[in-house]
Every structure is written in C-alpha cells, then in structure tokens.
Amino acid sequence: MAQARISAKANEGRFCRSSSMADRSSRLLESLDQLELRVEALREAATAVEQEKEVLLEMIHSIQNSQDMRQISDGEREELNLTANRLMGRTLTVEVSVETIRSPQQQESLKHATRIIDEVVSKFLDDLGNARSHLMSLYSACSSEVPAGPVDQKFQSIVIGCALEDQKKIKRRLETLLRNIENADKAIKLLEHSKGAASKTLQQNAEARFN
C-alpha cells in the first residue's frame, strides 16, 4: 500500500514537471514569435529609411541640374548650390544597411541582373534612345502589371531567381534610371531650344542690319 502511494506521488511529480516544461516552452515560443514581428518591423523601417535617402539624393541632384538653376544669376546659383551640397552631405551621413539573406543561386541571379543593367547604363552616352527602350523592357520584366511595351523574357527569368528584397531593389533602380534619362532628355531639348532661339535672334538682328 505504501509502495503504491510512493509510485503515485512519483508519477504525479513527473506529470507536473512535464506540464511545467510544456508551459515554459509555449511561453518562450510566443515570445520569439513576438520578437520575430519586431525584427521584421525593424527591417521594414530600415528599408524605408534607405529608400528615403535614395529619393532625397535624387531630388537634390535634380534641383542642381534643373533648367531653373541655369536661368538665375551666377551669384544666386552659387548660393543655392552651396545649400544643395550641404544637404547632400548631411544626407550622406545617414548610413543604413539592410543585408539580404540569399542562397548561392539567388546571389548568382543578382550578379547576373546587375551586370545586365550596368551594361545598358554604360551605353547611355552612345545612344540615349536605345538605352531608354532597353531599360523599359527590363522594367516591364519586373512589373506585375500588364506591360505597355515589350518584355525582356530572359531578364524576367533572372529576376525571378533573385531574393524578393533584391527584386524590389532592382525595380527601384530601373525606375530611377528611367527618370534620370527623362530628365536628361528634357535638358537636351531645352538646350537645343535655347540654341535655336538664340540662333534665330542673331539671324533676325543680322537681317535688320542689312535692311
């Protein structure tokens, strides 16, 4: 009888310990789940800061190279450039780095995609129009919407092989490059228009002298 009571108490102790361990494990797992949400929120916030830095630098650069900047006095332009350079310097002091975990295959796909974009960029000065068309086909390959133009199928398959975060970065880079080309094209047209207007004025002045 005494032996039975001892065995019952031993079994009860084992049950209590097992139940207690399960509770601890459950609490620890719940804590880790909550921490995982905070880690993802941290990465998203850091990525947002990284993107905001890129946007700010692009906007400052755009202002410095705008047509309005060319149509003000030298003194005003110098003062505004000093302010723009100061803002750019302060922006560059913000260092944010969000590392992407990649498999060897994803790493290789990213290198391949980056190399293709770099090759197009290197041809900007030779043929701006063709570079724009090529970039548009690359961008269409990254878009989930129905593309308006041709899609580079080979590039699309390469991008699909990249990590999701890298796919987003590739798309953002292409968007930035296309905006830069558009701004450069506008600047060239404005310059040509200014030259044409100046040439026309000179011609009219010359004709007026002869008359």
Swiss-Prot record:
What residue stretches are annotated with the BAG domain?
Answer: 109-189
Query: Which cysteine pairs make disulfide bonds?
Result: none
* UniProtKB keywords: Acetylation, Chaperone, Coiled coil, Phosphoprotein
The record's annotation in SMART domains points to: BAG
| Entry keyword annotation includes Translocase | no
As stated in the Swiss-Prot or TrEMBL entry, residues carrying the post-translational modification Phosphoserine are S20, S31, S73
Coiled-coil zones: 20-61
GO MF, one annotated term:
adenyl-nucleotide exchange factor activity
GO terms in the biological process aspect are: protein stabilization
Q: N-acetylalanine occurs at which residues? A: A2
Could you give the subunit structure recorded for this chain?
Binds to the ATPase domain of HSP/HSC70 chaperones. May interact with NWD1. Interacts with HSPA1A (via NBD), HSPA1B (via NBD) and HSPA8. May interact with DNJC9; the interaction seems to be histone-dependent.
What is the annotated role of this protein in its UniProt record? Co-chaperone for HSP70 and HSC70 chaperone proteins. Acts as a nucleotide-exchange factor (NEF) promoting the release of ADP from the HSP70 and HSC70 proteins thereby triggering client/substrate protein release.
Protein name (Swiss-Prot/TrEMBL): BAG family molecular chaperone regulator 2
Say which species the protein is native to.
Bos taurus
The organism's taxonomy opens as:
Eukaryota, Metazoa, Chordata, Craniata, Vertebrata
